[in-house]
Each structure stands twice: as structure tokens, then as C-alpha cells.
Amino acid sequence: MRRTTLIAIAAAVSATLAVSGCDSSDGDGKAPRKQAAPKADGQSINAHPVSDLKQGGSLRFGIDQWITQYNINQVDGQQGDAQDIITAVLPDLFDSDAKGAIHANPNFLVSAKVTSTSPQVVEYQLNPKAKWSDGKPLSWKDFQAQWKALNGSDEAFEAVDTSGYEQISKVEQGSGAHGVKITFSSPYADWQRLFDPLYPASYIDTPEKFNKGWSQKALVTASSFKVGRYDRTAQTITLVPDPKWWGDKPKLDSVVYRVIDSAAETEAYLNKEIDQAPALLPEDYKRLVKAPDTDIRRGARWDEVHITLNGGRGPLKDVEVRHAVSAAINRDGVNESFSKDLSFELKPLNNHFFMPNQEGYQDNSSEFDKYDPEKAKKLLDAAGWKDQGEGKPRTKGGKQLTLDYTLSAGSTSSATDQAELVQQMLGAVGIKVSIKQVPANDYFNKFVNTGNFDIVSFRNVDAVYQTMLTPVFISPKGKNLFQNFGSVGSPKIDELLTKAAGTTDHAEAVKLYNEADVEIWKLGHSIELYQRPQINAVRKGLANFGASGLGDTDYAKVGWLK
């Protein structure tokens, strides 16, 4: 089972800072030593054979908000915690190891391979033991229904991402009762990311079922765990072992997700209410590293923190105003203001598709994210926003240049500090920023996902395949923003992303993604800040869990040491 394997949208409110490398001063008052970034395959999970684990016990997590959509392929299902939960109870056909290499999951697949390249044909043999919790076997019909819902041919299905699925021409029964045969109309290199997780056909085969059927709970499951209880009053979601599971029996009795404000997670961990907490902020790290019975586990994850600019409304519809905002924000200053007390130096991230520890990374930011407040002023002058003097917002047509920075009420102090820094920097060039706090449970559903903001900051995580980022940068279609919440895109970017997804030549794909990245910077889509490594405080006796880096977590193998 995975913990966030699709691209997840995780609010920067959950922690805007990253700590990595070796231990800091551990609270001794000395300045921490700056360390190099972790290796691409870096992970720390306290690995043990299952025989070392005792039977029983619970694993408890904090989540940011109550889940209101469990169909993560639907536009409202993009909250990271929802993806964590649903990928733990639905079939994940492929798993990623510590180096990011993809392997078929034998619990669901006997085999999966490309059997023809012209046209591209992929054939799966499903595990005959694999069944949904309603007793029906997994079959080619599940694949067909998911393809029809996600291929973009019927816009009534509010799909968050059609890439890959729209390149499939046919889904049919393959060899034998458990075979699936998928034919592509054009090559698609990342075919393993499709149908992962897999949803049951009879619960997503109409727009009504697809869009609304999963809005309150996971209707059907097929994994080592199932949802045992949704407790809206206690704000908890409890997973329990599924007795019908055909694979290795889980060691844990339950996995409990509890809604906790991000700022309260450290206290909840110290009070032994949860078993993991992010040790990302200096004030949290100093407390957690000294907590009894605690390991600090570190990993190198695909995890970026950025600021999204909404080009779909207001002053930011003008690309020159977006460039002015970028030029007015000192990324080094924002990052350094947080990293000064950390053991890891937060260097500016200059690529939207690749992390610095990945093959393919190059700096494509050009002049578009260089700190230059004088340039910002000139851009605003040229855009018709007149300077009204120091400390006053610029005006145009009698209107003040004012932007909202939307922030969750559950934000950490660092997220609030970041918003205030941006407010000060933009104020210095004549842009008034109002920090707008909204209820944590509404942050994504009513604001981010709907484009109801001017400026927000959150994270994109676990983009093991670059095609997973397609919905972040493709042009919206009508009211469907996909994951391009700021509505900034172009036909040229769409074309480059389509070409990149369609080539099976890895070097060519890397080249095309970097070409698309150049165009994304030119449009002022977003302001990249930094890559965020994993730093987690975890109970010392917990095995096969912690900071998994690029790898996936198999919850059937997670448990407490004897």
C-alpha cells in the first residue's frame, strides 16, 4: 500500500519548512551545521522482517481536514490526505522502491507488459484471488469504466486529469478470464501510472456516481485494510484489516487518521495521541528530537513548495503583473528566513518538473524569478499601475492594486510568517496584500480547488512520473481547472506536455519537459521556492515506516517490534 503515490496537493500550512541532512544542534543553543541534500534513494524506515513484528497495535496519524471526496480522480479529490487514505484501501497496481523504480504489485498483478509497440498494446494478467469487498473479482470491466470516466470524451465526468487515458483507443478482455488488453492510439511512456489506484466499475460508471458517489466515504475497497469507521464527531477515520484479504495478513489492528490542526501536531505527538509528526520547523524539531522513545527519520522525497499566482482573475490576469510579483519576492530571503535555524540549506528551486537530486534537473527560471524590485516597479508602471508614493498601493482607473493571500486558519507559524514576508515585499513595490484566513476544512474545497484566491502557497508531492504534473500546467477547460488552480497555461505548453507524454525516448521526454518548463516560467504560472525533504518524528518501536523518500509504504508490513 502507498502513502501518497499520485500527485497530491498538500497545503504549505502543514509545514513550509524543510529540515534534512544530519542532526542539528539538538537544542544545545549552537548554530546548526548546514548539510548537503539527501541522496535520491535516501529513506529511513527502520526496516525489519515481518517476523520481528508483534501482532496488534494501532498506528495513528494527524490529517489536515475532514475528507469530503474519496474519488481522487475527481476534481474535488485532490487533498493529499484523501489520497493517502484511498490508496491504502484500493488496488495499487504498481509500487515504487527507494530509487523510484516501478514494480508490479503481485497482490493484484501476475504480469503487466507492453506486447506491441505499433500500436502500443499493454496486457495485464490480474491475480485471480483479487476481489472487491462486495465479492466481485477485479476485471477488465473496471479498467474500461475508469478509462471511459477519465478519457475526456464526456465532460460530465469531472475528471482531474485525462492525460494518458485520452490516448487509449480501446480497453477489452485480454487472454483468459483475468486478462486485460489496452490499446493506445499513440505511444504513452508512463502507462504504469494509469489505473493506479483502480476503482470498481459499478461505482464510477455514470457521472453521478463518479462525481458524487464517493463524496462521504469509500464505497468499496480491495486491499489489506478497509475503512472500519468514519466518526465525524471525533473527526477520525479508522482503517482495519480486511478479513477477506488474500495477501499477507497485516500486523496492525488499526490505522487511525485524526483531524488535527497542523500547528498542534507536535503537541499531539508529545501527548502520545499520534505516532508520527513532521519535525520540519525549528521549534518543533527542538522539542521532538528530545522526546522519549522517538526516532527522527529523514528521506529525499519529490516535494516542492511554491506560490501559485491566479491568472484567472483580477490584476494577476496580466502576465506583466505576475512577473512583477515574481521580481518583487526575494526567494533567497524567504528561504533563508526559515533555514537559518535548520540543518539544511533551502536553495531556490528552479524547475517545475524535476527536483535537484533528479536526472533532468536544470535551471530554467532565466530572468523571471530573479529578485529585482526596481524591475518590478517598471513592470507595474508599464502595466498602467501608477505609483502613489512610498507605503501606498498603486492605482489604475481609480482602483487600488490589492491582492489577497489566502491562508488556512490551521496554518503553522512559518506559513503565516511566509505570508507576512510576501506581504512586506510586495508592499515595497506598491502592491497591497491582504492576508485572508479561511477555515481549514474549506481551504481546498472552497478556495484552492475553485480558483477562489489571488495568491496561495502549497506543495506538489510524489510526482514519480512527470506526466503526473500534466494537470498542474495544462490549460483549463471551461470550469474544470484540473490542478491548474491559477488558470495560467498556453497551447504551446499543452502541445509540449502532450509530446513529452507520448514519447518512449526518455532523453527526448526530459528535453520536452524542460522546454515546457521554460514556457511555464515565461507565463509566470507560479513562484518555486524549494524542495522539501522529509523529516519525521516517529515512535522508536515502529518498523517499516517513517521517511520513505521515493518509495511506497506497504502497511501490511508496518508494525511494532516485539
Please tell me what each predicted stretch does:
Residues 232, 386-462:
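Ligand/substrate-recognition segments at binding pockets and active sites
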Residues 99, 196-250, 254, 373, ...:
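Gly/Pro-rich hinge or "lid" segments in bacterial periplasmic/extracellular proteins
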Residues 241-287, 432-434:
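Ligand-site clamp/hinge motif
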